[in-house]
Amino acid sequence: MRILVSNDDGFHAEGIQVLATELRKIAEVIIVAPDRNRSAASSSLTLVEPLRPRHLDNGDYCVNGTPADCVHLALNGFLSGQVDLVVSGINAGCNMGDDTIYSGTLAAALEGRHLGLPAIAVSLDGRQHYETAARVVCDLIPKLQHQLLNPREIININVPDLPFEELKGYKVCRLGYRSSSVEVIKQRDPRDETIYWIGPSALPEDESEGTDFYAVKNGYVSITPIQADLTAYHSLLSLQNWLDQEFTK
């Protein structure tokens, strides 16, 4: 098996290096990742400037682009040979609920899915036990073979920031959701000009049993199938009925 690994925290982040080291025990691995932190880049592609991949001594690559750029580049003729699986992570911090909208970690996996490959996104609910998340991924890859064959979904994994031995197990979950975003942070820079920072993530609003928030909070690894199709199917009929009524008045 040959695995393409990417992330949004950047090539030099601890999470991706720990992940690649562990994956290399079970497969051939090549990293193509951003050359800097590109957190919350979502699925953006770089269209107004060229991508410049830099070949590193160990055979991996870092790129002056987004996570989606890296996977798009790697799988569209840049890499030679077959790739069997895309794994994105390990993200420093969870990607649960509404986080998935902004996440560059998920975007890299979704780009792999878009290009026809099975894909996994993995995040750690903290910044300490990356080795736990890496072991989880290596443990799950053989077990997820059937599910990974679905070309229209990715698997989103969130891991509690605990030693591996303290994990309670695995739960398949739906996404929870957070409350409205907190206000931006207003400051003055050294030139006395007003600047703004995007604030931290809002607190979970739906962390009921069955959600990813609930699982991770209670010591379980959450496993959530994610699809790129954003259609609200439950609203199609009611919207069509409304439209029909409006045009028959």
From Swiss-Prot:
Pfam family for this entry, one: SurE
Gene Ontology, cellular component aspect: cytoplasm
Family, per entry: Belongs to the SurE nucleotidase family.
Reaction(s) the record says it catalyses: a ribonucleoside 5'-phosphate + H2O = a ribonucleoside + phosphate
Protein name according to UniProt: 5'-nucleotidase SurE
PANTHER family (alphabetical): 5'-NUCLEOTIDASE SURE, 5'_3'-NUCLEOTIDASE SURE
Record text on cofactor binding: Binds 1 divalent metal cation per subunit.
Primary site of residence: cytoplasm
Annotated InterPro entries: SurE, SurE-like_Pase/nucleotidase, SurE-like_sf
GO MF annotations, alphabetized: 3'-nucleotidase activity; 5'-nucleotidase activity; exopolyphosphatase activity; metal ion binding; nucleotide binding
Enzyme Commission code: 3.1.3.5
Function: Nucleotidase that shows phosphatase activity on nucleoside 5'-monophosphates.
